[in-house]
A protein has these predicted regions:
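Sec-dependent N-terminal signal peptides
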Residues: 4-13
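Short, low-complexity N-terminal intrinsically disordered segments enriched in polar/charged residues
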Residues: 16-45, 49, 164-165
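Hydrophobic pocket/interface hotspot
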Residues: 35, 46-48, 55, 74, ...
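A solvent-exposed, acidic/Ser-Thr-rich amphipathic alpha-helical stretch
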Residues: 45-108
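Short beta-strand segments enriched in hydrophobic/aromatic residues
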Residues: 51, 59, 114-118, 133, ...
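Short beta-strand micro-motifs enriched in acidic
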Residues: 98-102, 136-142
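Exposed beta-sheet edge and beta->alpha loop/turn motif
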Residues: 107-140
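Low-complexity, intrinsically disordered terminal/linker segments enriched in charged
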Residues: 142-165
Length: 165
């Protein structure tokens, strides 16, 4: 009985080991914070300079089934948002570690949930919407994978200029 109890204790203690954090996670959180700060500053040059030549980006618009796979396409996607909105602000709720989809181990990527606010440039209508984002950086701090999840189409429709009667 003592041996069974001892084995149980050893098993219980062994299963309490916390998973190891990827050593790049904290650095990538800082890169992510800078990414969103420059969205708020509408600094397309900075944002463009942080996108890798090899990229996969999932946009958030309705029927957007394909990843953007070129830097130019991702920059055009961002540019469209920046042209349509002003006074942009992202208020993150958190920055969470991402995992490799094949191994389920922390891979240094960053996930964040937060609230975007701003004003539509054409209509002057304000918006407030929750989004989820994921960003993966390479060893040089370049964005190589990312995406947005939220109701982008709904936001655009909600703040569009009113039709003229």
């Amino acid at each position: 009985m003592k041996k069974i109890f001892l084995l149980f204790i050893i098993f219980a203690l062994g299963s309490c080991v916390a998973p190891q954090q990827n050593p790049n996670f904290e650095k990538n959180v800082e890169l992510t914070k800078a990414w969103f700060e420059n969205w708020e500053n509408e600094d397309l040059d900075y944002l463009s300079s942080k996108i890798g030549e090899s990229i996969e980006w999932q946009g958030a618009f309705y029927a957007n089934k394909e990843y953007f796979t070129t830097k130019e396409d991702v920059v055009a996607y961002i540019s469209g948002w920046l042209a349509a909105m002003e006074d942009i602000n992202y208020e993150p709720e958190n920055f969470l570690p991402g995992v490799d989809p094949e191994t389920s181990l922390p891979n240094g990527s960053v996930r964040t949930y937060g609230t975007w606010t701003g004003v539509n440039t054409a209509s002057g209508k304000p918006f407030e919407v929750k989004f989820y984002h994921y960003l993966t950086f390479d060893d040089n701090g370049m964005l190589v994978n990312g995406g947005d999840y939220g109701d982008a189409t709904g936001v655009v429709m909600a703040v569009a200029p009113d039709p003229e009667s």
